[in-house]
Amino acid sequence: MYSFMGGGLFCAWVGTILLVVATATDHWMQYRLSGSFAHQGLWRYCLGNKCFLQTESIAYWNATRAFMILSALCATSGIIMGVLAFAQQSTFTRLSRPFSAGIMFFASTLFVLLALAIYTGVTVSFLGRRFGDWRFSWSYILGWVALLMTFFAGIFYMCAYRMHECRRLATPR
């Protein structure tokens, strides 16, 4: 059980760090504009060596930002529950901490999937036509890696929960 929780906690830490870095950085998309390279993130866009805040309130950017922030918050909550799962005292007999941590990591995975799906759909259908020479960049890719890490953290914690439940049910009362 502890090895699953340890693996889950490792994946969760890495996934949460990647979520925060992906959300905060400005390299979701790179493109060529007027002969020079430009890149943009969720909060700023940069032309040459100058960066500017994205002041327009565009729905897909707002949705992507919100889902990325919710994902990071769920992952952080899952880490807290995951660390508390190592403690053996049962404060809540009906609430399993590994199960709760796993649910939080799956919620984090869902939120980051929604954010990346929205960003991908709009970028490919709208911005891809506007900028001929463009590509997704490393911040965007970190988001996908974070999705995998939070998903595997959820899997590990669910395995720890199942192992704990099987042992609990097998012991005579």
UniProtKB/Swiss-Prot annotation:
GO terms for cellular component: bicellular tight junction; membrane; vesicle. It is a multi-pass membrane protein. Its main location: membrane. Pfam families: PMP22_Claudin. The keyword Lipid metabolism does not apply. Residues 25-66, 120-140 are extracellular. InterPro entries: LMIP (IPR003935), PMP-22/EMP/MP20-like (IPR050579), PMP22/EMP/MP20/Claudin (IPR004031), PMP22_EMP_MP20 (IPR004032). GO terms for biological process: camera-type eye development; lens development in camera-type eye. Keywords: Disease variant, Disulfide bond, Eye lens protein, Glycoprotein, Membrane, Phosphoprotein, Transmembrane, Transmembrane helix. It is found in: Membrane. The modification Phosphothreonine is found at residue 171. Residues 1-3, 88-98, 162-173 are cytoplasmic. Glycans are attached at residues 43, 61-62. One of its GO terms (molecular function) is structural constituent of eye lens. Present in the thicker 16-17 nm junctions of mammalian lens fiber cells, where it may contribute to cell junctional organization. Acts as a receptor for calmodulin. May play an important role in both lens development and cataractogenesis. Seems to be associated with itself or another lens membrane component via disulfide bonds. Belongs to the PMP-22/EMP/MP20 family. This is Lens fiber membrane intrinsic protein. It comes from Mus musculus. The lineage of its organism: Eukaryota, Metazoa, Chordata, Craniata, Vertebrata.
